[in-house]
Swiss-Prot record:
InterPro entries: EF-4 (IPR006297), EFG_III/V (IPR035647), EFG_V-like (IPR000640), EFTu-like_2 (IPR004161), G_TR_CS (IPR031157), LepA_C_sf (IPR038363), LepA_CTD (IPR013842), LepA_IV (IPR035654). The gene is lepA. GTP binds at residues 14-19, 131-134. GO terms for molecular function: GTP binding; GTPase activity; guanosine tetraphosphate binding; ribosome binding; translation elongation factor activity. This is Elongation factor 4. It comes from Shewanella sp. (strain ANA-3). It holds the Pfam family GTP_EFTU_D2. GO terms for cellular component: plasma membrane. Its EC number is 3.6.5.n1. It catalyses: GTP + H2O = GDP + phosphate + H(+).
Amino acid sequence: MKHIRNFSIIAHIDHGKSTLSDRLIQVCGGLSDREMDAQVLDSMDLERERGITIKAQSVTLEYKAKNGETYQLNFIDTPGHVDFSYEVSRSLAACEGALLVVDAGQGVEAQTLANCYTALDMNLDVVPILNKIDLPQADPERVAAEIEDIVGIDAMNAVRCSAKTGVGIDEVLEVIVDQIPPPEGDPEAPLQALIIDSWFDSYLGVVSLVRIKNGVLKKGDKFKVMSTGQNHTADRVGIFTPKQTDKTELKTGEVGFVIAGIKEIHGAPVGDTLTLAKHGAEKPLPGFKKVKPQVYAGVFPISTDEYENFRDALNKLSLNDASLFFEPESSSALGFGFRIGYLGLLHMEIIQERLEREYDLDLITTAPTVVYEVLLTSGETIYVDNPADLPAINNIEEMREPIVEANILVPKEYLGNVITLCIEKRGTQVNMVYHGNQVAVTYHLPMAEVVMDFFDRLKSTSRGYASLEYNFIRFDPADMVRLDILINGDRVDALAMIIHRSNIRHRGLALVEKMKELIPRQMFDIAIQAAVGSQIIARSTVKALRKDVTAKCYGGDVSRKKKLLNKQKEGKKRMKQVGNVEVPQEAFLAVLKLNE
């Protein structure tokens, strides 16, 4: 056991995490040079295209150290993006140490900091590593000082390496062996294994990635999942070298996979504990905190007969992504679909792309909303994540919106732009600290403003240098109202949105104008109105198409023309009473695009 090292790598996006892991695999001979592929661990197409890591992966490597001993290194890859911080805390729970990789040109960024604090809270040993020293703009001295100043760990003797050229990789491996402690645990105790991740394989059923904390799991053992109490037999156990390699047993401290032919999707929830069916452990391991979705959106299949496939796809996806939440929803305009909860907008985009790619679905998404806390006049408090569920205005005592604490790291010269942006988004400044050339600003911002387009705007006002990390802190009373869109006097539920009272005029007008362009003309006038409660704040009319009924009159009396025109008017009036308007799909998409 003292030759096992479990570690993960924490880094900001693009600081070279995945490349460094490729090098470690290559040096330790996990794959032959022919199979070596850039970003081996980012196995999803989407991860490669966007160049980000989304899912945690694991690899077991053998390393012969300079002291002549052979060590087993279990390396768990983690994502760096703020929306996937949950995946990170999960990976860290299985480790004893973490490598903090910092780009020697860019320096410390907000996410690095957030994930690093998560690691320190879990009592992991954090080892700093300066990467990309081959770049001309690399300044390892400055960055080392920055790490000490901002993060507060000693970085003067930090290993300097370049994952791209392979310089300093051996030193990295030595540091892992020297500075990261071996796992603790009792091989004789009853089995306790933590499920770090699980995914669905159409041939094998559920595959779970586990970290053995105590005891041993052998092939053929009967084990039980502690939260569900169900028993299964371990058909195969093994490790990833990144290839799946079968073994006869997983010992204490090791990280590997278990396949038990579990067919039903929620058979092995992530964060759960496995133990043996006979002499099992008394209590489960402390898992992870369940994440609450921050953003909700209704997602509907474009053709209604895809509803079943859509449900299956969501079930399979939620196994692999523990933070996904969904419940069925129906809309009079869009038919049947699901209300899905996400951790943030990037998460939402990724999930939607994965559904469209991996499961071949055509989907339409309504505007994203956050969760509001609503105090009713009856004294009870409810949580609303769908604008259509908001009670009538006269039943609401107080609306409270979620507030996030946003930590922004930005170079001095862009500070002004960032502050202007935060004020525009109704933020209040809490703190500001200068660290050398960087400034750390803390703001309290309404989450609704953050999820819309804050991140993109932040990047563009700071030329991409600012970095953001945010978490939910509390609900604050706010003057929020529901903006409804009425078409010929009927509310269209899928177009409703909850916004701040100061924005309603501007938003209502823009929406109504946009809808006017998109709704095709009918044989009668269509009134498009934006309303708050019973008060109409904006209106426009799609004019009717009409036939020229007076064309056949040559001269003659005006009363003849009047008669024909009045007859046409009567007809249009009757038509309007029975006619109903189809709202085209583009109109729903337009509402989303309006924020841009």
